[in-house]
């Protein structure tokens, strides 16, 4: 059973119910973190501080519930270094999985308004693949990768349009990693995260 929720929606009653369900069937709880950076979190209106995420992960871990964390690569204003800081932070958390999502700009959103006003650019396919590979190289080899890209609804997608060719992006990822002779965890240094 996979349940996607916000860290600030995990009260004691919900945690108790999830623990009970976990005795019947394995439960994975998916939490949307997106980024560890407060300025970016405020811009995208995440709506809770990093400490709330940390408390939720701690509470889920204490109940032996598996945790998958959603991150977004390419958020406006974030550098590659900041995105890697989010990955390195997650290496220190008692989580079991990660979803690495590309930023999608969808029609009818404030993000779309900012994009169309030229306030930020989305990542090119090459930039995304380079950044994604760097994230994978730094990611603990013990974490299960549940997603490395996604595709927004085609009728709403403004940018990046290349992301709608999901299979091709995945094929390029596999090819580039093979050519570079790299893999998940290649640059992971466990002693940095203890």
What are these regions (language model features)?
Residues 91, 97, 105-194:
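Auxiliary Fe-S-binding modules of radical SAM enzymes
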């Amino acid at each position: 059973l996979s349940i996607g929720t916000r860290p600030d929606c995990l009260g004691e009653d919900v945690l108790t119910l999830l623990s009970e369900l976990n005795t019947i069937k394995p439960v994975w709880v998916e939490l949307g973190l997106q980024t560890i950076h407060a300025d970016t979190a405020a811009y995208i209106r995440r709506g809770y501080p990093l400490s709330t995420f940390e408390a939720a992960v701690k509470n889920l871990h204490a109940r032996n519930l598996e945790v998958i964390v959603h991150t977004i690569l390419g958020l406006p204003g974030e550098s590659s270094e900041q995105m890697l800081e989010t990955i390195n932070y997650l290496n220190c958390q008692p989580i079991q999985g990660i979803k690495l999502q590309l930023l999608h700009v969808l029609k009818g959103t404030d993000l779309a308004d900012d994009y169309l006003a030229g306030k930020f650019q989305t990542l090119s396919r090459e930039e995304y693949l380079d950044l994604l590979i760097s994230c994978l190289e730094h990611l603990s080899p013990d974490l299960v990768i549940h997603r490395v890209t996604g595709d927004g609804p085609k009728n709403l997608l403004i940018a990046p349009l290349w992301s709608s060719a999901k299979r091709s992006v995945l094929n390029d990822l596999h090819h580039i990693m093979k050519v570079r002779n790299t893999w998940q965890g290649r640059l992971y240094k466990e002693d940095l995260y203890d």
